[in-house]
Amino acid sequence: MLGSIPDLLRLVAVPVFGWAAYRDVKTRRVPNRTWTPLAALAVVLLLWDAYTVWTGPTAVGQRLFLIRVAISLGFVIPLSYGFWLIGGFGGADAKAFMLIAVLFPIYPVYYLPMPSVALPLQQTAIGVFSLTVLSNTVLAGVVYPLAVAAGNLARGRFSLAMFIGRPVAVPDVTEEYGRLLESPDGFDRGGLDLDALRMYLQWRGCSLADIRADPAQRRLPTSLPAVPNDPGDGSLATDGGDSASGDVAEPSANDIGADGMDHPDQIDDPWGAERFLDDIDHSAYGTSPQQLRDGLDVLVEQDEVWISPGIPFLVPMFAGLVVSLTYGDVLFSLLQAVGLA
């Protein structure tokens, strides 16, 4: 396969995004250092292309290049940042899309060892490659709930949550990523975030098994420790986080109850949810006191719950990048097929 040196160097992104997608599935966390070398490479290659085009023979090519780069940088980057601000993207997802906007503003070209065949096969009229990656990522993401539903159907699992989740035994919940799809009132897409659950358990120094063993006592604010633990970030212990399954500092008998006496107004705070969220110096992934209370109520009553692992967005992004580099723009092809492009 042949191409320009900048386009060949851009292929370094494929294994990097593949590794990031794997990390997203396994840990839901991608280190910031993953993107730094690739971002530096992206800037260098963009300047390289700009110099090549600017010293080229035609002004038309220069204008097209500038327009496409302007769309990529001026639309995809703000869009990614906006989705991150409203919670639609995680931090790693937003950084990855911003990187795509700089690394792939225009279509790369890779010539195969066959006459007149070059990848990507299907290009768009606008010619902004980062938009192609974005649209292919969205299409790949649409497949996810269909695959989840098919898996649940094959296992005989029927529920309102079957398109976005799967059932998990409650004792195993703290070893999962995602959020509960249940509240005391039934199906609820806005259930408790499991990272926030791990933070809460770490903060109060007990395991979910301890909570389930004596829910009536643990629900009382007087059962909270006077000196809570650092809640951490809710990551699993195998990913470098603090364990939320019992390997934490249990409060002593002298610690329990003292704070409840000092804060009589907290008596109407089941599970100490408000105190937990007031005590930590950062957000517990947007969790409200009521979400935490409802989630704990479900977890002490049920033996199995439905959870949504969420879409590890770097996975469809990696798939979208690979499809974009080989086939091209799937959405554009579909629109052409129905006469809309």
Swiss-Prot record:
Keyword Cell inner membrane appears in the UniProt entry: no
Pfam families: Arc_PepC_II, Peptidase_A24
Region described as Disordered: spans on this chain: 219-264
Catalytic activities: Cleaves the signal peptide of 3 to 12 amino acids from the N-terminal of preflagellin, usually at Arg-Gly-|- or Lys-Gly-|-, to release flagellin
Keywords: Archaeal flagellum biogenesis, Cell membrane, Hydrolase, Membrane, Protease, Transmembrane, Transmembrane helix
Membrane-crossing segments per the record: 2-24, 30-52, 65-86, 93-103, 127-155, 313-324
Extracellular side of membrane: 25-29, 87-92, 156-312
EC number: 3.4.23.52
Primary subcellular site in the record, as a coarse category: membrane
Gene Ontology terms for molecular function: aspartic-type endopeptidase activity
Site entry (Essential for catalysis), positions: D24, D93
Membrane topology field: Multi-pass membrane protein
Task performed by this protein: Cleaves the N-terminal leader peptide from preflagellins.
Protein name: Preflagellin peptidase
